[in-house]
Amino acid sequence: MAAPPARPDHTRLLHICLLLGVLVEIRAEQIRYSVFEEQEEGSVVGNIAKDLGLAPRELAERGVRIVSRGRTQLFALNPRSGTLVTAGRIDREELCDRSPNCVTNLEILLEDTVKILRVEVEIIDVNDNPPSFGTEQREIKVAENENPGTRFPLPEAFDPDVGVNSLQGYQLNSNGYFSLDVQSGADGIKYPELVLERALDREEEAVHHLVLTAFDGGDPVRSGTARILIILVDTNDNAPVFTQPEYHVSVHENVPVGTLLLTVKATDPDEGANGDVTYSFRKVRDKISQLFQLNSLSGDITILGDLDYEDSGFYDIDVEAHDGPGLRARSKVLVTVLDENDNAPEVTVTSLTSSVQETSSPGTVIALFNVHDSDSGGNGLVTCSIPDNLPFTLEKTYGNYYRLLTHRTLDREEVSEYNITVTATDQGTPPLSTETHISLQVMDINDNPPTFPHASYSAYVPENNPRGASILSMTAQDPDSGDNARITYSLAEDTFQGAPLSSYVSINSNTGILYALRSFDYEQFRDLQLLVTASDSGDPPLSSNVSLSLFVLDQNDNVPEILYPTFPTDDSTGVELAPRSADSGYLVTKVVAVDRDSGQNAWLSYRLLKSSEPGLFAVGLHTGEVRTARALLDRDALKQSLVVVVQDHGQPPLSATVTLTVAVADSIPDVLADLGSLKPSADPDDSGLTLYLVVSVAAVSCVFLAFVTVLLALKLRRWHKSRLLHAEGSRLSGVPASHFVGVDGVRAFLQTYSHEVSLTADSRKSHLIFSQPSYADTLISLESCEKSEPLLITQDLLETKGDPNLQQAPPNTDWRFSQAQRPGTSGSQNGDDTGTWPNNQFDTEMLQAMILASASEAADGSSTLGGGAGTMGLSARYGPQFTLQHVPDYRQNVYIPGSNATLTNAAGKRDGKAPAGGNGNKKKSGKKEKK
């Protein structure tokens, strides 16, 4: 890179000349203004724009501004008007102190021409400060014996203003003792002096108050003042003097310690130590110093000890006063003590009995005491008294002795202890009295038996209470005390239901709390009568009895018990018959239940919980009658399953359910064609049923597989033109036939030949279940066939299928059940009031077994219903005369809502037919009703 060419020297010289020219021009251009101090902010100092010959708007264009530095900016440039104004209040005294000339400089820069303008502003003083003294008050001490003409310097005033506004002179207020003289120093400062004109007397006037005034020459004139206190210093030229030569005072005896007796006073006109007077006792005796005290500064005489008139009634005290230098004065204080009734009577008990039996006779001496008063005259006369409401009296014997006696017989139950206050009062003014307290205990005797607050008690206990439960707390009161009031509780011995009462309840002998020793059952007993005895421990003991009725409250703790229909022992359900010709409202059967509870807990309601055919049957809410809700149709399934729930109204409610199987057919043979419910073999070693089931399942499976194979072959023949379907068919040849259940035509086959094997834990009791086949001569729809349930066939029935002689015979159309022949509780036929229920579950099971046995005989056609051996007497027992009756004694507790009857031994009416006569369990067979 080439080096830059060197500048010629004449260029540098040109710059220096220009700079010098600017400096010369700057010095030449200087502006001077003046302004008074204490002007408001924004006050105009001068017009910069006018002095520079510029228009106001050119100031901003040319960049005119103040560049002064180093101190607070006092001025500002108004850019609109071009004037120089004050930036705040200006204090000349703060800025220039006492300098006679106060000038401040500032510089203004013109940026376009780089010119600096120098401006001087003179601050003109105003009289804004008055003369002031350093202190508002000055004290000057002058001895009272000072000679006239003596000078005393006074404080100087200061005025920060200058010139004529500064301090000009002093003035002193007029007085008869002092004058003012002002001296001027070489520096021009004036010094004021105080001059004593005549002799002083402190006792005449101790302090002189003067006012010194300083003033300036401003307009208006300002001034300042200072207070001058001339304090005269005393000399000891006077002795103390008492206000009285003798002081007389009277005081009552026994005044409190510290009481002010009187104040002695001595005066001394001197001041300070010369006038400070102190007091003291003169010729002090020990007795005086113990009873009286003199304050050495104030002269107060106070009581230091107890004054007693009996000791001394008069005191003579010498008092002395002296000032600081030692001048003294003397006086006397004469004290008279006044007598007062200051002694209260004294009571001394010489004999006292602290306790007395409540049976003591009137006039028994309780105490003997003496009274004494150390005062004399009326102050020593004493009278004694006791409260009027007490059963005691005072008797004065001799001298000042008194006896305290009983006035009547005492009763400890009314008042067990007496606090007797004996008051002894003298006749002084004011009277003084003394109280003595005598405590007397009244000893108890056993004269009150325990009492119960109630004549009898009743307690209510819910049944099923836990053993040891608290039933009731019984409390007896005995107004006696001690052992006479210690009560024990017991139960009177008795028996209930052959057992002692002590096995049912017990009572705490100390607290009277009754406890249950067993869990009560409302169904066993409902109330218990007890006799509670309360005995005290006195000698002899006293006692009282009170009766207690214990009522057991019923709880809903018994589930409704279904009496009919009963549950068979083989876990199957009973079968009820409903003819297909039955209309709406036909009584199929009746559910009968009882509840061992009472009240609402035994109020039962019936409702249909579940039905295989909704809307076909209805159950009476309060009667339990199962009736048809509509007429039976041919499409209705042969077997209908109903679940009836029986619920009480307890809290919480309890319920029981029963499952009813209703066979829809006109006669039993119609039912037995497809329905069987026989008792399984009881032989546990018999395995024939299991083998038979296995063989049957295998045979049916083979037939089903063959059918599916044939059906598949027909389908493949129809689709043989399709190679794809042919290939799929060859792959399906090894698939089990059960995969093709959904093929058309199989559904009808399955309806006819489908089967189900129910294997329970005991395979010998397993059932083979067949669905009812569809016959061409029956009018059962496909839907009803699908809804029908499988029928149970036990092993005994299956074994008969192998015998050709045991084939089902045609049903006998005469063997039909009428409405009156159905088992029920309220009489499904015309019965008498003496008909009975089955005595137990065994009878009900026997009834179902006979129905099934008869159905088996009807199936093989080997017997009739004439009551022979083969029928087990079905026609004789399964008729109107065999009605169910509930035997237990709690039937009368059952209330059937909706009727006025209760469950009794009489059979209810049904279907509006009158009952037939009969006795005991032997009933005449009713006529069969034909539909």
From Swiss-Prot:
Under the heading Pfam families, the entry gives: Cadherin, Cadherin_2, Cadherin_C_2, Cadherin_tail
| Topological domain ranges for the Cytoplasmic compartment | 714-931
Keywords for the protein's UniProt record, in alphabetical order: Calcium, Cell adhesion, Cell membrane, Glycoprotein, Membrane, Repeat, Signal, Transmembrane, Transmembrane helix
Where exactly are the transmembrane stretches of this chain?
693-713
Naming one, the record's GO cellular component terms include: plasma membrane
How would you describe this protein's topology in the membrane? Single-pass type I membrane protein
Q: Which residues lie on this side of the membrane: Extracellular?
A: 29-692
- This chain is glycosylated at 419, 545
Compositional bias ranges of the Basic residues kind: 921-931
- Compartments (UniProt record): Cell membrane
Matching SMART domains: CA
Q: Which InterPro entries match?
A: Cadherin-like_dom, Cadherin-like_sf, Cadherin_C, Cadherin_CBD, Cadherin_CS, Cadherin_N, Protocadherin/Cadherin-CA
Task: Drop me one GO molecular function for this one.
Answer: calcium ion binding
The Gene Ontology biological process annotation of the record reads:
cell adhesion; homophilic cell adhesion via plasma membrane adhesion molecules; nervous system development
- Gene3D superfamilies cross-referenced by the UniProt entry: Cadherins
The UniProt entry lists the main location of this chain as membrane
| Stretch list, region Disordered | 801-840, 901-931
Q: Which residues form the Cadherin domain?
A: 29-133, 134-242, 243-347, 348-452, 453-567, 570-682
Q: What is the residue range of the signal peptide feature?
A: 1-28
> Bias regions of kind Polar residues — which residues?
805-840
Q: What does this protein do?
A: Potential calcium-dependent cell-adhesion protein. May be involved in the establishment and maintenance of specific neuronal connections in the brain.
Q: What is this protein called?
A: Protocadherin gamma-A4
Q: From which organism does this entry originate? A: Pan troglodytes (Chimpanzee)
Q: Gene of origin?
A: PCDHGA4
